[in-house]
């Protein structure tokens, strides 16, 4: 492992889970009636998948690849310098900085995610992508508050089959 991966590595991460309960995925898969899919989006990790759901608010993608809606449409960002950086470099998305070993895959996956997602119900200039670790404004870092935030969502409920 490279140094910045050590803190995230879980050597016994599946300990206690029966092997027959683990399903290894090589590609994207549909779940249930097809209204939810796990889409392979290598980048954040080697086996990363994004959850895509057909909701009352359109197609929604949730992922660990980006940290804010600004990352998926930097040209609309109000964060100081972000829109200018995207324009100068031609960057369609802005990757987060914690997985440099897969930077190309992460960039491609973020473009894929925003292409799948419908428009955001919060601000239709942005895709309907909900980062699993969404950036939050913080007073110690002025000027870095996301332009728009997805916030929390609740859709349906889990039901255990009889």
Regions flagged by a language model, labelled:
Residues 26, 42, 64-66:
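Residues at the C-termini of beta-strands that transition into short coil/loop
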Residues 30, 42, 52-54:
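Well-ordered beta-strand positions
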Residues 39-48:
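Histidine-centered catalytic micro-motifs
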Residues 52, 56-162:
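Cap/insert and terminal regions of metallo-dependent hydrolase folds
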Residues 1-40, 86-95, 99-108, 113, ...:
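Metallo-beta-lactamase
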């Amino acid at each position: 492992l490279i140094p910045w991966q050590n803190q995230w590595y879980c050597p016994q991460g599946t300990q206690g889970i029966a092997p027959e309960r683990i399903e290894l995925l090589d590609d994207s898969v549909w779940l249930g009636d097809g209204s939810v899919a796990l889409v392979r989006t290598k980048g954040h990790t080697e086996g990363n998948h994004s959850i895509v759901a057909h909701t009352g608010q359109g197609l929604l993608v949730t992922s660990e690849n980006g940290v804010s809606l600004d990352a998926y449409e930097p040209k609309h960002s109000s964060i100081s310098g972000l829109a200018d950086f995207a324009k100068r470099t031609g960057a369609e998305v802005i990757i987060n900085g914690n997985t440099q070993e897969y930077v190309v895959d992460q960039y491609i996956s973020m473009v894929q995610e925003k292409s799948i997602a419908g428009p955001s119900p919060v601000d239709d200039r942005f895709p309907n992508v909900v980062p699993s670790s969404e950036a939050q404004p913080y007073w110690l870092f002025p000027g870095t508050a996301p332009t728009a935030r997805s916030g929390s969502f609740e859709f349906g409920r889990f039901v255990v089959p009889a």
